[in-house]
Amino acid sequence: MASKLLRKLAYPTLPVKGKIYDPFSKFQQNLYGGSKTEAGNNKIPKFGHKTRRVWIPNGHSKWLYSNVLEEKFHLYVTSRVLRTIDKEGGLDEYLVKSTPSRLKSLGLRGVELRALVLHKLGAKNPILEKLPSDSGAQKRYLEKVKDVVLKLNRSKKLYQQIKSLVGKERSVNTSV
């Protein structure tokens, strides 16, 4: 029982909390850096008439190369995110950097790519590092962590999708 839970929780864990209202929107499926379509009014100064208008993010279709995954990804990115990727030193560095605002603005696609990059890099998992050696304590610890991970990952369905993207799980030695 404990080893099954351990394999489920081994990787990936998503770092973003909160509810996603529209998971299939273009803002979740691409790297928009948190920017979305805004609506408002244009006001004519002389007469004070208002007209409705929409401001759309400055998005571009780009092929971005990941050095770690050795693969190109076709993504829509805003010019601001593109400048940040250049400043960070590449797509992998942009995805791996874990500032709270960056993690919130990645979107679902960004989080999936981040999980793939971290898995390929073999990043240490804090869940596995704190695993007790006693089997009874291990079971209680994993049950407690399972609830937290599922809350962080927002839903079981999304967790399963990302788990299938990562592919074969790392074999974990439970006698840590």
Swiss-Prot record:
Transmembrane segment boundaries: none
GO biological process: mitochondrial translation
Transit peptide: 1-8
InterPro entries, alphabetized: Ribosomal_bL28, Ribosomal_bL28/bL31-like_sf, Ribosomal_bL28_sf
GO MF annotation terms: structural constituent of ribosome
Superkingdom, taxonomy of origin: Eukaryota
Keyword NADP: no
UniProt GO cellular component terms: cytoplasm; mitochondrial large ribosomal subunit
Compartment(s) of residence: Cytoplasm; Mitochondrion
Keyword entries, A-Z: Cytoplasm, Mitochondrion, Ribonucleoprotein, Ribosomal protein, Transit peptide
PANTHER family: 39S RIBOSOMAL PROTEIN L28, MITOCHONDRIAL, LARGE RIBOSOMAL SUBUNIT PROTEIN BL28M
The protein's role, per its UniProt record: Component of the mitochondrial ribosome (mitoribosome), a dedicated translation machinery responsible for the synthesis of mitochondrial genome-encoded proteins, including at least some of the essential transmembrane subunits of the mitochondrial respiratory chain. The mitoribosomes are attached to the mitochondrial inner membrane and translation products are cotranslationally integrated into the membrane.
Family: Belongs to the bacterial ribosomal protein bL28 family.
Subunit architecture: Component of the mitochondrial large ribosomal subunit (mt-LSU). Mature yeast 74S mitochondrial ribosomes consist of a small (37S) and a large (54S) subunit. The 37S small subunit contains a 15S ribosomal RNA (15S mt-rRNA) and at least 32 different proteins. The 54S large subunit contains a 21S rRNA (21S mt-rRNA) and at least 45 different proteins.
Protein name: Large ribosomal subunit protein bL28m
